[in-house]
A protein has these predicted regions:
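Long, histidine/aromatic-enriched segments associated with O2/redox biology
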Residues: 1-259
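Generic alpha-helix initiation/capping and coil-helix boundary signal
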Residues: 51, 267-268
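Short, intrinsically disordered, low-complexity terminal/loop segments
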Residues: 65, 295-297
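Alpha-helical interaction segments
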Residues: 227, 268-270
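Serine residues within intrinsically disordered or low-complexity segments
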Residues: 255, 273, 283-284, 296
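A cross-taxon signal for low-complexity, glycine/charged-rich
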Residues: 260-263, 267, 276, 284-288, ...
Length: 297
């Protein structure tokens, strides 16, 4: 289980400054597509090999939190086939593994060493429109082949493919990485989509990828996948290292400590509530090979 804390919640709960890059998710408005900002207070990412284990842990968490929180979105997700998304393509192929994943996902020094920034977006797919494309057209949207998951050659890679928009480099030509832990979700008779989650030592990497996708690179040349996938949520959380959570009481504001007693019922929210769209998220799936063993999920 990973626990993420939103910017507003951090300010209300803790008497220490926010981690450097913790802020509300910034909405993006492109010429054709937009990414909404739906700030939340708490985010729980639960993983297990079976759904019942996730359900039981989620139930215990909610019992402990009680009336202090309101649940605004709970997504039960799953591993789909050989790590494919509902569009039929393998997801997370370029996500780093092993120590490279640790370096990309976890802050490696300073007061927040071992922590990570989480950005989540819940995408719903228009599968009717997607399935109307030929396989070759779909491959040009994604930038990879559908059957064997091979990246298209550079001279065939569209400038607006999903691969192109998510490939960014620093000034020295080194590719900047994040750890993706996307989940498929949906009902056969209803809504189907992908729950995007990125873990990063520096969320500005993910934010740059999203700006390229929605605003375009150059401007107007947006990620073609957005013609078929629409984000419903957008949140940024910070997952503190376990040691901080173990000693959270010593960092809490006086009003947030248990001995402070109940909050004034006339106030709009308790210290643990007021999440607008994603107060609690129970995501379940089988473990994936690309997730490093020492990166708790």
């Amino acid at each position: 289980c990973v626990v993420g804390i939103g910017a507003g919640m951090w300010d209300r709960l803790f008497d220490v400054p926010r981690p450097e890059y913790l802020h509300d998710f910034e909405a993006l408005q492109g010429g054709k597509h937009s990414a909404p900002s739906t700030p939340g207070d708490l985010f729980f990412h639960l993983r297990a090999s079976t759904l019942d284990m996730c359900f039981e842990l989620a139930r215990q968490i909610m019992r402990r939190l009680g009336p202090a929180v309101s649940t605004y979105d709970e997504v039960h997700a799953f591993r789909y086939l050989d790590n494919r998304d509902p569009l039929g393509f393998v997801d997370g192929t370029e996500s780093p593994r092993g120590q490279a994943a640790v370096a990309a996902a976890l802050i490696n020094e300073g007061a927040w060493a071992g922590g990570s920034y989480i950005i989540e977006q819940k995408y719903v797919h228009n599968l009717t429109a997607w399935d109307s494309l030929s396989v070759e057209e779909q491959e040009r949207v994604i930038g990879r082949t559908k059957l064997d998951d091979t990246q298209l050659p550079d001279d065939e890679q569209p400038t607006n493919s999903h691969v192109t928009m998510n490939t960014i480099e620093d000034a020295d030509g080194n590719e900047l990485q994040i750890v993706r832990d996307n989940l498929a979700f949906g009902e056969a008779s209803g809504e189907q989509g992908t729950f995007f989650m990125s873990y990063a030592a520096d969320p500005r990497v993910t934010e740059l990828m999203l700006r390229r996708m929605f605003l375009g690179e150059p401007e107007g040349n947006y990620d073609r996948i957005l013609d078929f996938s629409t984000p419903l949520t957008g949140c940024l959380f910070f997952a503190p290292p376990a040691a901080f959570l173990d000693d959270a009481d010593q960092y809490a504001r006086p009003s947030a400590r248990p001995e402070a007693g109940p909050q004034d019922p006339t106030q709009p929210a308790t210290e643990l509530s007021a999440a607008k769209d994603l107060g609690f998220n129970a995501s379940s799936e089988a473990p994936r090979d690309q997730t490093p063993d020492d990166h708790s999920n």
